[in-house]
A protein has these predicted regions:
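Glycine-rich loop at the start of a catalytic domain that most often binds anionic cofactors/ligands
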Residues: 54-55
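Extended, alpha-helix-rich binding/interface surfaces that flank or overlap catalytic cores
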Residues: 51
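Structured surface interface patches that mediate subunit assembly and partner/cofactor docking
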Residues: 2-27, 31-44, 60-93, 97-168
Length: 168
């Protein structure tokens, strides 16, 4: 999956995968105990709260960009602490926002992102990959044992292989 490919046809698979990968994340975020929010994660610079903040931001970016707003329009409002007083509710809200823009028409569009132009399909596929990895980070940081969805992992492998091939 090259991020500069803007000719892909929209299909239901990437948004369905993204919604499926967000489900376990919602369950895991809901299970984080109060005393665990500052636990370390595999990302050296992020504790669980910062990691969940990152995911909330990604979901809100999807909503903003696929909803027609520009990076400049939303950059300030999507920086900083997005978890607020209730990170669990903030995650659930961000998930609903992301899901609300996953229509085939919006996925077929081309959007200006921080790295260049991408179709909605490419953008959602990128976010699917990020969320899948972050699910593992949440599990590790919170000590939860949740099995990865085999179909989602299988869907991620060719995307990862294409990315590796693209960078040489």
């Amino acid at each position: 999956m090259t991020m500069d490919n803007t000719t892909k046809t929209a299909s239901a698979e990437p948004p369905a995968r993204y919604v499926r990968v967000m489900g376990p994340a919602a369950s895991m975020v809901s299970a984080i105990k109060l005393e665990q929010w500052h636990n370390a994660t595999p990302c050296d610079e992020w504790d669980l709260r910062v990691l969940v903040n990152h995911i909330i931001g990604e979901n809100r970016w999807i909503h903003a960009v696929l909803g027609g707003r520009t990076l400049e329009d939303v950059r300030d409002e999507l920086n900083g602490d997005l978890t607020g007083d209730d990170p669990i509710a903030a995650y659930a809200d961000s998930m609903a926002l992301a899901e609300s823009v996953l229509t085939l028409a919006q996925l077929a569009g081309t959007y200006k992102l921080s790295f260049g132009l991408a179709t909605g399909i490419d953008y959602v596929t990128q976010m699917f990959m990020d969320q899948l990895v972050r699910n593992g980070d949440i599990m590790k940081g919170s000590g939860q044992s949740v099995a990865f969805d085999d179909e989602l992992v299988a869907a991620a492998i060719p995307v990862a292989e294409e990315e590796v091939a693209a960078v040489g």
